[in-house]
C-alpha cells in the first residue's frame, strides 16, 4: 500500500487516537513531586538535565547534574532530524514540492533506476525509501555528502522496509538544494525554522562543499529544545507566528505501514497501550532486516498521541498534546528506560 492510501488510513487512526487520548487525559496535571522522582532516576542514569512544561508554564526544572547546566548546550544528536522535518514541511508549504512527489523529478539521475525512480519525498522523511542507511556519511572527512548520498544503493523496494540512517535526510538536503535554485539550504532553514524559534549558532557539521548534515549535530539547552515542543503544541505556530500549517504538521505524525511508530522525522507512541514496549535505541542497533517495528511503542502508559524527538544517548523531547505537556531529558549514554522515566513523570508508578 503506497502513499495517499496508507496516509488516509493512518491519519484517520491518528485522529481516533487523539480523541481517545484527549478524553482520557483531559485536565490531568503533572505533579512536581512525580517529576522530582523521575529526575532522580534520570540523574542515576547519567542524566544531565530535565525540563517539564505544561499549559505553557515550567512546572519542573532539574537541578542540573553530570555536566549539565541551565545555560550550557548539550548534543541532541538525531534530535536534529526533527528540526529538518519541520523545514521539509515549510518547503512544502512554500510550494517547492508536494510530499508525495517522486524524488526523481528533481534528482533526475534516478529516473532510470527501477527502485529509486519510485521513491517519494515522504519516503525519504519516514526512512522507508529502501536506501541503505549509510552511517559513514557522518564522517567529517567526506568532501561532498550529498553527492555520496544520491549514489547509495537501494537495498529494498520503497515502502517495504524501515532502514534508519543519515542517508535519507542527506538526499533530501540535495533535493532541497536543487529546488532552491541557488539559494542556500542553511539560509533557508534559518529563515523558515531556526530563526523563528530564536535559535542561533547551530552546528550544521558542514562538509567541504558547505552541505549540512541534517541527521545530527545540533547542541541545545533543554529550554531551547523545548521550543520545538511549543511549536508542535501550537499546531505549527510558535509565539503567534505560523511556521507550518497545522494540516501539514499532522502529516508528520502519521506512521508508515512498515513502522507505525515513526512519522516524518518524529517517533510516535500511537500503537500504545496494546503494543510491546521497546527501547528504540537498542532496536536501531539491530540490522534493519532483523528489527521488527510493527506493534511496538515507547511507553504503554503514556498517551497514544505522544510524539518524540529522539537522539543517541537517550536525548529526548517528549511532546504530549493531550496533556499540553513538554518533557526534555538530556544525558550521557547509560542503561536508561524511556518507559520507566515516563511512568515516573506521569505518576504511573506508586
Where in this protein do the model-derived segments appear?
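Conserved catalytic neighborhood of penicillin-recognizing serine enzymes
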Residues: 110-139, 151-160, 167-170, 220-223
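Active-site SXXK
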Residues: 56, 74-100, 124, 172-176, ...
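A short, well-structured edge-of-sheet supersecondary motif
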Residues: 38-68, 317-320, 324-328
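Short, charged, amphipathic alpha-helices and their helix-cap/turn boundaries
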Residues: 58-62, 104-105, 134-158, 164, ...
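Active-site Gly/Thr loop motif
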Residues: 199-202, 255-326
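Active-site helix/loop module of the DD-peptidase/beta-lactamase fold
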Residues: 75, 93-131, 180-216, 220
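Bacterial N-terminal signal peptides
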Residues: 10-21
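Active-site-proximal alpha-helical segments within enzyme catalytic domains
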Residues: 171-175, 217-237, 315-329
Amino acid at each position: 500500500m503506497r502513499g495517499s492510501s496508507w496516509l488516509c488510513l493512518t491519519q484517520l487512526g491518528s485522529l481516533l487516537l487523539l480523541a481517545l487520548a484527549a478524553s482520557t487525559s483531559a485536565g490531568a496535571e503533572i505533579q512536581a513531586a512525580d517529576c522530582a522522582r523521575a529526575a532522580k532516576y534520570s540523574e542515576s542514569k547519567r542524566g544531565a538535565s530535565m525540563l517539564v512544561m505544561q499549559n505553557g508554564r515550567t512546572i519542573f526544572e532539574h537541578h542540573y547534574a553530570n555536566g549539565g547546566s541551565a545555560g550550557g548546550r548539550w548534543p541532541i544528536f538525531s534530535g536534529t532530524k526533527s528540526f529538518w522535518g519541520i523545514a521539509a514541511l515549510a518547503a512544502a508549504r512554500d510550494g517547492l514540492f508536494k510530499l508525495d512527489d517522486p524524488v526523481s523529478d528533481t534528482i533526475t539521475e534516478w529516473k532510470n533506476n527501477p527502485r529509486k525512480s519510485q521513491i517519494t519525498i515522504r519516503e525519504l522523511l519516514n526512512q522507508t525509501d529502501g536506501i541503505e542507511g549509510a552511517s559513514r556519511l557522518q564522517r567529517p572527512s567526506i568532501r561532498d555528502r550529498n553527492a555520496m548520498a544520491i549514489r547509495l544503493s537501494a537495498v529494498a523496494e520503497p515502502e517495504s522496509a524501515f532502514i534508519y540512517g543519515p542517508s535519507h535526510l542527506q538526499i533530501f538536503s540535495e533535493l532541497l538544494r536543487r529546488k532552491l535554485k541557488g539559494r542556500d539550504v542553511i539560509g533557508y532553514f534559518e529563515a523558515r525554522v531556526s530563526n523563528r524559534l530564536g535559535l542561533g549558532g547551530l552546528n550544521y557539521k558542514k562538509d567541504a562543499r558547505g552541505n549540512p548534515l541534517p541527521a545530527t549535530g545540533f547542541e541545545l539547552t533543554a529550554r531551547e529544545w523545548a521550543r520545538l515542543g511549543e511549536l508542535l503544541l501550537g499546531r505549527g505556530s510558535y509565539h503567534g507566528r505560523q511556521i507550518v500549517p497545522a494540516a501539514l504538521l499532522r502529516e508528520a505524525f502519521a506512521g508508515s505501514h512498515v513502522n507505525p511508530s515513526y512519522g516524518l522525522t518524529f517517533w510516535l507512541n500511537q500503537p500504545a497501550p496494546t503494543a510491546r514496549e521497546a527501547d528504540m535505541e537498542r532496536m536501531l542497533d539491530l540490522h534493519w532486516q532483523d528489527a521488527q517495528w510493527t506493534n511496538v511503542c515507547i511507553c504503554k502508559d503514556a498517551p497514544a498521541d505522544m510524539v518524540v524527538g529522539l537522539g543517541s544517548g537517550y536525548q529526548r523531547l517528549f511532546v504530549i498534546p493531550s496533556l499540553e505537556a513538554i518533557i526534555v531529558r538530556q544525558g550521557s549514554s547509560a542503561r536508561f528506560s524511556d518507559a520507566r522515566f515516563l511512568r515516573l513523570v506521569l505518576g504511573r508508578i506508586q
